[in-house]
Curated annotation (Swiss-Prot):
Catalytic reactions of this protein: (S)-lactate + A = pyruvate + AH2
Subunit composition and interactions: Homotetramer.
UniProt-recorded name of the protein: L-lactate dehydrogenase
Annotated positions binding substrate: 24, 129, 164, 278
GO cellular component labels: plasma membrane
NCBIfam families hit by this protein: L_lactate_LldD, PRK11197.1
Entry-linked InterPro entries: Aldolase_TIM (IPR013785), Alpha-hydoxy_acid_DH_FMN (IPR012133), FMN-dep_DH (IPR000262), FMN_HAD (IPR037396), FMN_hydac_DH_AS (IPR008259), LldD (IPR020920)
List of residues binding FMN: 106, 127, 155, 251, 306-330
Keywords: Cell inner membrane, Cell membrane, Flavoprotein, FMN, Membrane, Oxidoreductase
Disulfide bonds: none
Main function: Catalyzes the conversion of L-lactate to pyruvate. Is coupled to the respiratory chain.
Native species: Pseudomonas fluorescens (strain SBW25)
Top EC class for this record: oxidoreductase
Length: 380
């Protein structure tokens, strides 16, 4: 199969993965309107082409929280990554390090913090949910700190799980889910051997180490469902801000006032995110939410963005809308599922090439030069 874009990796991942896993990556909440809008709204943003400008010395490098990045991209935290490829979190972290960008490990990863951090040539980031079990949160923070994690990403848009209808149909949840997953795995023998058999253990590494016992998919669903905390407020996070001395990012911001509250709280950065359209259907796409948020707080903290980003062209669009860098979730998960570490490295090469073309044809030579003037009819 010819691979030239993230959409090609999506098709390859769909062929390789059992349906329940592919739909878990690919699906969103409710009827998935917001999930689709994330990509479609971004695609409608027009860049301003410029000609006869010297763009010979072009660079994708940038700096985020004092860390130099070879391009303004971070691999986003994605749950169960170790089920898409054998020890998938390790492979993704290695790919990111080789390409000079950060990798962020999910709370609900298969591989534990210690395994991933020890095998990455670059310090990793760690994502943490706000959960009722504060003991787990403290344990995870202490382990992350001991493993050399540099940056903490706090996901705050999950006080309750989103209604993901596709998961019920695919076997991730719903009646006879375990039996349906087993039958699906039997139809994908390559995945069943490489990941299902050779990728063991399939524990949720960060959780099982805390609980002191193996944790499997049903444990993941049940434990998380019982631990989401709808009572959480900014005040409940104060102890974490005091404990964590490195950069702390609040992920899940869609409203300018919430962004201002993050500044008051003392966050170093935010991620403008609707969780890839996986939480509340009907909210703004991140392409539409980003500009007013960047205008409100862009001078006070680092603004990052995710959701709907499928190309280097999309990265340039998001930077022009006000982001400092972009997080890649689904795109990197597709590439990992399709071809492991090599797939992720190739995807990042594709993004870099697409960015270079976009920058060349819009007449900019550095990431810092990309701003609202790079766009037609947006934020001018």
């Amino acid at each position: 199969m010819i691979i030239s874009s993230a959409s090609d990796y999506r098709a390859a991942a769909q062929r390789k993965l059992p349906r329940f896993l592919f739909d878990y990556i690919d699906g969103g909440a409710y009827a998935e309107h917001t999930m689709r809008a994330n990509s479609s709204d971004l695609a409608e943003i027009s860049l301003r082409q410029r000609i006869l400008r010297n763009v010979d010395n072009l660079s994708l490098k940038t700096t985020v929280f004092g860390q130099e990045l070879d391009m303004p991209v971070i691999l986003s935290p994605v749950g169960l990554t170790g089920m898409y490829a054998r020890r998938g979190e390790v492979q993704a972290a290695k790919a990111a390090a080789n390409k000079g960008v950060p990798f962020c490990l999910s709370t609900v990863s298969v591989c534990p913090i210690e395994e991933v951090a020890s095998q990455s040539a670059r310090a990793i980031w760690f994502q943490l949910y706000v959960l009722k079990d504060r003991g787990f949160m403290r344990n995870a923070l202490e382990r992350a700190q001991a493993a050399g994690v540099t940056t903490l990403v706090f996901t705050v848009d999950m006080p309750t799980p989103g209604a993901r209808y596709r998961d019920a149909h695919s076997g991730m949840s719903g009646p006879f889910a375990a039996q349906r997953r087993m039958l699906q795995a039997m139809t994908k023998p390559q995945w069943a051997f490489d990941v299902g058999l050779m990728g063991r253990p399939h524990d949720l590494g960060n959780i099982s180490k805390y609980l002191g016992k193996p944790t499997h998919l049903e444990d993941y669903i049940g434990w998380l469902a019982n631990n989401f905390d709808p009572s959480i407020s900014w005040k409940d996070l104060e102890w974490i801000r005091e404990f964590w001395k490195g950069p702390m990012i609040i992920k899940g911001i869609l409203d300018p006032q919430d962004a201002k509250d993050a500044v008051s709280f003392g966050a170093d950065g935010i991620v403008v995110s609707n969780h890839g359209g996986r939480q509340l259907d009907g909210v703004l796409s991140t392409a539409k939410a980003l500009p007013p948020i960047a205008d409100a707080v862009g001078d006070d903290l680092t603004v990052l963005v995710d959701s709907g980003i499928r190309s280097g062209l999309d990265v340039v669009r998001m930077l022009a809308l006000g982001a400092k860098a972009c997080l890649l979730g689904r795109a990197s998960a597709y590439a990992l599922a399709a071809d492991g570490q090599n797939g992720v490295e190739n995807l990042l090469d594709i993004f870099a090439k697409e960015m270079r073309v976009a920058m060349t044809l819009t007449g900019v030579t550095s990431i810092e030069q990309i701003d609202h003037t790079t766009l037609v009819g947006q934020r001018q």
